[in-house]
Amino acid sequence: MNYNETLDYLYSQAPEYQRIGHAAYKEGLDNSLALDEIFGHPHKKFKNIHVGGTNGKGSVSNLLAAILQMSGYRVGLYTSPHLIDFRERIRVNGEMINKEYVIEFVEKYRDKFEPVMASFFELTMEMAFLYFAEKKVDVAIIEVGLGGRLDSTNIIFPDLSIITNIGLDHMNYLGNTLTKIAAEKAGIIKKYTPVIIGEIGNSDVAQVFIDKAKSVEAPIVFSEVYMSDFVADRLRDKIFYKSAN
């Protein structure tokens, strides 16, 4: 296979619900877990930050990756969708995964993952995990694809979870109210794992996150409580702390 043929193969694994609609939507993480078992759980070899929410996931993920890289860490970044090049989805210290690795992943492991009937998203995710492990990243920023609770990325055990905000998105899959959607997004909150919540929207949404965090003993921080202490200067591209003076 050349690179374009490899991409055609990967795209052909797009789940039926993407082509047909909600009627073909299958709940559960069985495929993701089975695929991860085949590869030996590579995401356990580095720290993870899981980023979910309705809007701003990509921006937050990229900002975090840049901050950590500037702090001296080797950083993996997994985001979706891509704009131009498939390889935008998988980066280490800002550099996209090379084409040869994408080809090698499919050719080398195809016989192993095809019996699982893994989707495009599951394969891409596992490719990222394996690549990050082989590149020996210190930490990986993992962006949720859709929802949270049943997203293929939700097999990881992150060191920090982030939920940017809640809006009415993918209502056929996540629910038709903000609280129902919040409950799906809250699915990435893990036991004992700190979670940062961005824009709350309303008290009912906030309560969904509070209840979920309490049920798994996860420390929870609402960023809106702290952001009032800061002011953004967009002209100078700076953020200032408002002191008592």
Language model feature labels by segment:
Residues 1-52, 60-62, 66-71:
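Short functional linear segments
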Residues 22-29, 34-45, 70-156, 172-174, ...:
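ATP-dependent carboxylate-amine ligase catalytic core
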Residues 48-50, 75-77, 155, 161, ...:
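Conserved beta-strand scaffold positions in the cores of enzyme catalytic domains, especially
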Residues 53, 121, 197-199:
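Glycine- and other small-residue-rich loops at beta-strand/loop junctions that grip anionic moieties
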Residues 57:
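Catalytic cores of secreted/periplasmic lytic hydrolases that degrade extracellular macromolecules
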Residues 64, 128, 209:
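Aromatic/hydrophobic pocket-lining residues that form π-stacking "cages" and hydrophobic walls in ligand
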Residues 136-143, 160-245:
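Acidic, Mg2+-coordinating active-site environments of NTP-dependent enzymes
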